[in-house]
């Protein structure tokens, strides 16, 4: 069994005033408040979501 790689992301900019789909993506990644951090599995789907809202998040 292989261990799944993870990726940590932090919400560094408020999604207020952004597109509704971008706000939904932030929520889909499990980020709520500013500076909240979440650790997710490193999959192509998660990478795509991070790429979509790259101006709102920071990869740690």
UniProtKB/Swiss-Prot annotation:
InterPro entries per UniProt: Ribo_uL30_ferredoxin-like_sf, Ribosomal_uL30_bac-type, Ribosomal_uL30_ferredoxin-like
What GO CC terms are in its UniProt record? cytosolic large ribosomal subunit
Keywords from the named record: Ribonucleoprotein, Ribosomal protein
Does the keyword Ribonucleoprotein belong to this entry?
A: yes
GO-annotated molecular function: structural constituent of ribosome
Q: What domain of life does the native source organism fall in?
A: Bacteria
Q: Which CDD domains does this UniProt record tie to the protein?
A: Ribosomal_L30 (cd01658)
- Keyword check for Ribosomal protein, yes or no: yes
> Which SUPFAM superfamilies does the annotation name?
Ribosomal protein L30p/L7e
Q: What Gene Ontology biological process does one annotation of this record name?
A: translation
Outline the subunit composition: Part of the 50S ribosomal subunit.
UniProt similarity note: Belongs to the universal ribosomal protein uL30 family.
- Xref: HAMAP family: Ribosomal_uL30_B (MF_01371_B)
Entry protein name: Large ribosomal subunit protein uL30
Q: Which gene encodes it?
A: rpmD
């Amino acid at each position: 069994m292989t261990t799944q790689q993870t990726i940590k992301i932090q919400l560094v900019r408020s999604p207020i005033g952004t597109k509704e789909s971008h706000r939904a993506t932030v929520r889909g990644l499990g980020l709520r408040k500013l500076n909240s951090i979440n650790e997710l599995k490193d999959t192509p789907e998660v990478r795509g979501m991070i790429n979509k809202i790259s101006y709102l998040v920071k990869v740690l």
